[in-house]
């Protein structure tokens, strides 16, 4: 399996796009960003450093189901602060194992002290599909001679 950095290089535009918010933002503002960007989680940054992650699950479980007001609740109050991170060199198979074991769908990618991207389960699934399509194509070519 390939390193995460290779997945980012294969993305449209060849980058590791990520969206971030501040712990001082309201949950309502965070949910707007999630919806506008079509992503399931945001990196939470404070003073240029990783402070946590906010996911749709955090919102659902810690705001919506508890009847809290998203315009009066702050990201810092519901974010996951103790975040599992990976490096750009982490292999995709290891990422799948981490996601499965921890029951998570997003992993911030950190190079040294710098957050360089966010890996999602969607990224991993798209990569598996692409690899399988390539394998099928190769097998078909071999069979046809």
Map each language-model feature to its residues.
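Tandem CBS (Cystathionine beta-synthase) repeat/Bateman regulatory domains
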Residues: 1-145
């Amino acid at each position: 399996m390939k390193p995460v950095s290779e997945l980012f290089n294969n993305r449209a535009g060849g980058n590791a796009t990520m969206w971030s918010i501040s712990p001082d933002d309201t949950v309502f503002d965070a949910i707007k960003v999630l919806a506008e960007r079509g992503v399931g989680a945001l990196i939470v940054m404070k003073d240029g450093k990783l402070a946590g992650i906010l996911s749709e699950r955090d919102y659902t479980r810690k705001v919506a189901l508890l009847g809290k007001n998203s315009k009066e609740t702050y990201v810092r109050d519901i974010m996951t602060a103790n975040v599992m991170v990976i490096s750009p060199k982490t292999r995709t198979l290891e990422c799948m194992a981490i996601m499965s074991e921890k029951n998570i769908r997003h992993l911030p990618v950190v190079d040294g002290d710098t957050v360089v991207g966010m890996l999602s389960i969607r990224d991993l699934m798209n990569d598996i599909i692409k690899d399988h399509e390539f394998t099928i194509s190769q097998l078909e070519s071999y069979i046809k001679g």
